Amino acid sequence: MSYRRELEKYRDLDEDEILGALTEEELRTLENELDELDPDNALLPAGLRQKDQTTKAPTGPFKREELLDHLEKQAKEFKDREDLVPYTGEKRGKIWVPKQKPMDPVLESVTLEPELEEALANASDAELCDIAAILGMHTLMSNQQYYQALGSSSIVNKEGLNSVIKPTQYKPVPDEEPNPTDVEETLERIKNNDPELEEVNLNNIRNIPIPTLKAYAESLKENSYVKKFSIVGTRSNDPVAFALAEMLKVNKVLKTLNVESNFISGAGILCLVEALPHNTSLVELKIDNQSQPLGNKVEMEIVNMLEKNTTLLKFGYHFTQQGPRLRASNAMMNNNDLVRKRRLADLTGPIIPKCRSGV
């Protein structure tokens, strides 16, 4: 309580009156005391990190050379402090000597005929390069030895030094022939419901317009004979996928659909998969290798639709996560098992299949 009473004495003081009563020297002292400087601020120069602690006038400009001379003279005049323990120069420990590597016994056992050893011992660099060129051992020569030997006239076999080593001859692989399918003619045959046309292959035909691909999807709605339809690498996009999804809801004949290596996004793929419950004839669907990844959310929705489908036997897509991959594999395995049981039922009698969980 006494401390609070002491503080109340200074609550009603007039600061302007107190400052007006101070002298010029007292104001200068107060200014120095209130000068806020940070000594730990590394961004400020050393002279600005603290207050000016002297009022003396400078004796002259700063000269670095004179300061260094003064410090050197002062260091020579004052004797160094003696060591508490004098240095005796005694060496302790053992001198490190590297171990000699053992010689290769194979190299030690190599012996040549006396005449050959004498010839190699007295051979010049040009003669050694000549031997290396004849034997084809170009790694025995350094670059300096190579150019010196090449410039000398005493070397015999200069062709061996400059000889070109022939690479391995590979069999030329011809480019894949372009797809011979006539786009317009095939479209007309689908519209006319040609019974001889059961497979449509438009793979790698990159100049097919998007309206033409959508016209194919519209024509397949009424076609009764086409069982395989493939448009791999045709630059198909989401509008084509939406048209194919509408076709799957109506078509009851198509068994294989391949739309790999295109520009279909996750929305187009989901639309295709969501059309599977309305289709009972499709047994194989391939959607892998699109221009952009589908994402975890789209993969989970695809798996949920696959688990509800009982007719699809092959699904061509590489899932990025292990969970959806295993669930899709189990769904395809169960569908193939149902086909096997139906086939056995036709031969031996009715077999009641096990109910799939979550369906």
From Swiss-Prot:
Region (Tropomyosin-binding) location: 39-138
InterPro entries assigned to the protein according to its UniProt record, in alphabetical order: LRR_dom_sf (IPR032675), TMOD (IPR004934)
Annotated coiled-coil segments of the chain: none
Cellular component terms per the entry's GO annotation: actin filament; COP9 signalosome; cortical cytoskeleton; cytoskeleton; membrane; myofibril; sarcomere; striated muscle thin filament
Alphabetical keyword list: Actin-binding, Cytoplasm, Cytoskeleton
Record-level GO BP terms: actin filament organization; adult locomotory behavior; lens fiber cell development; muscle contraction; myofibril assembly; pointed-end actin filament capping
Entry annotated with the keyword Cytoplasm: yes
GO MF term set: actin binding; tropomyosin binding
Subcellular location: Cytoplasm, Cytoskeleton
Alphabetical list of Gene3D superfamilies matching this protein: Ribonuclease Inhibitor
Subunit architecture: Binds to the N-terminus of tropomyosin and to actin. Interacts with FLII.
The protein's role, per its UniProt record: Blocks the elongation and depolymerization of the actin filaments at the pointed end. The Tmod/TM complex contributes to the formation of the short actin protofilament, which in turn defines the geometry of the membrane skeleton.
This protein's name: Tropomodulin-1
Source species: Rattus norvegicus
Lineage of producing organism: Eukaryota, Metazoa, Chordata, Craniata, Vertebrata
Gene name of this polypeptide: Tmod1
